[in-house]
Design a protein with these regions (language model features):
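Hydrophobic pocket/interface hotspot
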Residues: 10, 22-26, 34, 49, ...
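Short solvent-exposed loop/turn micro-motifs enriched in small/polar/acidic residues
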Residues: 62-64, 90-93
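Short beta-strand edge/turn micro-motifs at domain boundaries
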Residues: 93-120
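Hydrophobic/aromatic beta-strand elements that line small-molecule binding cavities or substrate pockets
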Residues: 66-71, 82, 94-99
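Short glycine/serine/proline-enriched coil/turn segments at secondary-structure junctions
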Residues: 74, 87-90
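A solvent-exposed, acidic/Ser-Thr-rich amphipathic alpha-helical stretch
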Residues: 23-75
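Short acidic-aromatic low-complexity motifs
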Residues: 1-32
């Protein structure tokens, strides 16, 4: 599977400083019934996803959201590492597992914070 364009639009939404433009990125990236689940939130639909983006942007003003790995994919699933940084300092890092629908839109995002724990 090629690197899906929808992932780039989703990332662009997190980095968009103009709130009036966030929705356009999300509509190019997300399925209408998108689910976003990470340790801090669970959202359903584009409206809730957009509200979460705005909430996180307000909580970490000036943050830069970036992928820190390539995108590994099979079937309709993608995984990649990411980080949030501000003024050159990493604020949070983690990884996402993203499911796409048949049209290549993001259907589900499962986010995890921090590195994986050590094995037993």
């Amino acid at each position: 599977m090629a690197h899906p364009e929808s992932l780039d639009h989703m990332l662009a939404a997190w980095n968009e400083p103009d709130a009036s433009k966030v929705r356009g990125h999300l509509e190019r990236a997300l399925a209408p019934d998108v689910e976003f689940i990470d340790p801090s939130v669970e959202t359903h639909g584009i409206d809730e996803f957009e509200a979460n983006v705005e909430k996180v942007q307000a909580a970490i003003p000036g943050a830069v959201y970036s992928r820190t790995s390539g995108v590994d994919s099979h079937h309709r699933l993608c995984r990649y590492n990411w980080q949030i940084s501000r003024e050159g300092e990493v604020v949070l890092q983690g990884f996402d597992v993203t499911e796409l629908n048949d049209e290549g839109e993001v259907r589900r995002v499962l986010g995890f914070f921090g590195p994986l724990p050590d094995g037993d």
